Curated annotation (Swiss-Prot):
The chain crosses the membrane at residues 31-58. A motif (Chlorophyll-binding motif) lies at residues 38-43. The keyword Thylakoid applies. One of its GO terms (biological process) is photosystem II assembly. It comes from Synechocystis sp. (strain ATCC 27184 / PCC 6803 / Kazusa). The keyword Nucleotide-binding does not apply. InterPro entries: Chloroa_b-bind (IPR022796). The gene is hliA. This is High light-inducible protein HliA. Belongs to the Hlip family. GO terms for cellular component: photosystem II; plasma membrane-derived thylakoid membrane; thylakoid membrane. SUPFAM superfamilies: Chlorophyll a-b binding protein.
Length: 70
């Protein structure tokens, strides 16, 4: 007998953990490297490299020289 999300077992005891969610299986196989993650990683790498070049042009020093001057 089911009433608003509760279920009674054969001894008429309340069992509110008896309703289980529907289980599904995703058939697509994906490891940690997805296309979206690779695109984002590439974009951030390009932004970082461009920032490095801009900093070198503006300061006139390379990264190693700039870090040594700190």
């Amino acid at each position: 007998m089911t009433t608003r999300g509760f279920r009674l077992d054969q001894d008429n005891r309340l069992n509110n953990f008896a309703i289980e969610p529907e289980v599904y299986v995703d058939s697509s196989v994906q490891a940690g490297w997805t296309k979206y993650a690779e695109k984002m990683n590439g974009r951030f790498a390009m932004i970082g490299f461009a920032s490095l070049l801009i900093m070198e042009v503006v300061t006139g020093h390379g990264v190693i020289g700039w870090l040594n001057s700190l």
